[in-house]
Curated annotation (Swiss-Prot):
Residues 1-24, 81-99, 291-364 are cytoplasmic. The keyword Lyase does not apply. The keyword Magnesium does not apply. One of its GO terms (biological process) is protein maturation. Glycans are attached at N229. This is Photoreceptor outer segment membrane glycoprotein 2. Belongs to the PRPH2/ROM1 family. Residues 44-61, 124-264 are lumenal. It is a multi-pass membrane protein. One of its GO terms (cellular component) is plasma membrane. It comes from Gallus gallus (Chicken). Keywords: Glycoprotein, Membrane, Transmembrane, Transmembrane helix.
Length: 364
């Protein structure tokens, strides 16, 4: 039993072909949009790759870029096919190609859906990458003289200023690392040496944060050092007073930023997927309607078009059987209880012969 059968006249077939020709060109534009969105996301990730650990976070932009390029090629070809389908004589040259084209387009639209869903599922991978990357960036913040890390201080400072954040999880992360280079510490000072000896790691740890953590909107001058020491500042209570530094961690700020981008890209990709799916359904109706009109022999008459020739269950069983048969085609099968009668027969040209050769008497 056919699924969603529709009857088409000659006029309806021609209009459907023209509409699909236009929609395929619109789909080329949607492919360019997908490519642009993937490229934009890739650039945004690359901008801050210094504070991200290496991982599979580029899989989403790479998927969108690839799908966008494929969309342009597939829909350009689809536009040409639909344009020729308005003429039954031209359709005959595409007749054998249209069904494989529809199958490939279905797989391609599935990739669009997969790319859209990946925009919503990569949050955990992104969060882990940001956590590890920011942890290392804060750890190496002081290494301004080491090649490969000399610009890391500027990167972290610009990040904290731009995203109004401080530390990885919060400003307390700076309390746990030595973020002041030993080059700028007076080793002859007793206070400095006491700082080094005050912890088992032998690091210069202070309850302070870099200047980039300061909130310029605060009416009070930035309290950058001795944040937990109330007696070090006039009219200051660490527990009750609102601090004039950024409280939000940079991991949370970056995660919110990238999540908002990926959510918008995911919505756009889903809308493009629905549009591509509707175009694919239209192409399927056009293919079946043109195929049936050729079988009838009356190019001006009516013809039926459908989504599936059989029911969903029958179509699924048919495709599964095709896949099974393809797997069995690579295996050598033998009939049960029967052996090849020639399997143990020796070749007469191989090995030594036991027959004694007789000499031929010479003619007298």
């Amino acid at each position: 039993m056919t699924v969603l059968k529709v009857k088409f006249t000659k006029t309806k077939r021609d209009k459907l072909a023209q509409i699909l020709w236009i929609l395929n060109w619109v789909s080329v534009v949607s492919g360019i949009i997908l490519f642009s969105l993937g490229l934009f996301l890739k650039i945004e990730i690359k901008k801050r790759n210094e504070v991200m650990a290496k991982g599979d976070i580029n899989s989403v932009p790479n998927m969108l870029i690839s799908v966008g390029v494929i969309a342009c090629v597939v829909n350009f070809l689809g536009g040409k096919i639909c344009y020729d389908c308005s003429d039954a004589n031209k359709f005959s040259r595409w007749k054998l190609i249209m069904l494989p084209y529809i199958i490939c387009t279905f797989c391609f639209t599935f990739c669009i859906l997969l790319g859209a869903l990946m925009c919503y599922t990569m949050r955990n991978e992104l969060e882990e990458s940001l956590y590890l990357g920011l942890r290392d960036a804060i750890k190496f913040y002081k290494d301004t003289d080491i090649p490969g890390r000399c610009f890391l201080k500027k990167t972290v400072d610009m990040l904290q200023i731009g995203f109004q954040c401080c530390g990885n999880n919060g400003f307390r992360d700076w309390f746990e690392v030595q973020w002041v280079s030993a080059r700028y510490l007076n080793m002859a000072s007793k206070e400095v040496m006491d700082r080094f000896k005050s912890n088992v790691d032998g690091k210069f740890l202070v309850d302070g944060v870099p200047f980039s953590c300061c909130n310029p909107s605060s009416p009070r001058p930035c309290i950058q050092y001795h944040l937990t020491n109330n007696s070090a500042h006039y009219n200051y209570d660490f527990l009750t007073e609102e601090l004039n530094i950024w409280v939000k961690g940079c991991r949370e700020a970056l995660l919110e930023y990238y999540t908002a981008i990926m959510r918008s890209i995911g919505i756009a990709a889903l809308l493009i997927w629905l549009f591509e799916l509707s175009v694919l359904i239209g192409v399927r109706y056009l293919q079946t309607a043109m195929k049936n009109v050729l079988l009838q022999g009356d190019l001006q008459g009516e013809s039926d078009g459908w989504l599936l020739e059989n029911s969903f269950v029958e179509t699924a069983k048919y495709n599964i059987n095709i896949i099974k048969n393809l797997g069995k085609a690579n295996q050598i099968s033998t009939v049960s209880g029967m052996n090849d009668p020639n399997i143990n027969v020796q070749n007469t040209n191989c090995g030594k012969s036991n027959v004694t050769a007789k000499s031929i008497p010479a003619a007298s």
